[in-house]
């Protein structure tokens, strides 16, 4: 199979998927295409029902959820200073993103929803749609504090059980809040306030002016 033939097949399959999504969701469809990939945006109140349709509709058949993650858009589009906001406006601070695969139709889809409350981000659990997201949702809860309503065992999975805060949030201090060490007097591991002084790190590129130019 030539590269041209393969590219044509991929484009045809992408158009078929777009048409099938339009037929399934109608006026509720919010679809974007970039770099040969489709992203479907779903309102939080339709998160579970939309994902169920994506899995069960014979024309879509996304049997497998290969990834689920949280995203914190707090500083999205910002420079090093708060007033330097140049990026696009988002629908909220926290989003949940899933990447789906249809083995039957051999196509993929990214689906995103926004938590409606920035102070207490919560969306429905997708455990009944794809049981494999169990630990993915626990990870997003642990690192971002996103609550998945209906999850039967929403506990931390990566950090300590007594950990305070959610380390992947953009406002979580880079140095953390506590550090641990072994105390020889108490003969056990103890926690104490972190002793690292936080500082702003501004990335910059240092290179010769003639870098990359012909010599």
UniProtKB/Swiss-Prot annotation:
Annotated keywords: Cell inner membrane, Cell membrane, Membrane, NAD, Quinone, Translocase, Transport, Ubiquinone
EC number: 7.1.1.-
Main location class: membrane
Pfam families linked: Complex1_30kDa
Protein's cellular compartments: Cell inner membrane
GO cellular component, one term: plasma membrane
Record flagged with keyword Cell membrane: yes
Family: Belongs to the complex I 30 kDa subunit family.
Function: NDH-1 shuttles electrons from NADH, via FMN and iron-sulfur (Fe-S) centers, to quinones in the respiratory chain. The immediate electron acceptor for the enzyme in this species is believed to be ubiquinone. Couples the redox reaction to proton translocation (for every two electrons transferred, four hydrogen ions are translocated across the cytoplasmic membrane), and thus conserves the redox energy in a proton gradient.
Subunit structure: NDH-1 is composed of 14 different subunits. Subunits NuoB, C, D, E, F, and G constitute the peripheral sector of the complex.
Protein name (Swiss-Prot/TrEMBL): NADH-quinone oxidoreductase subunit C
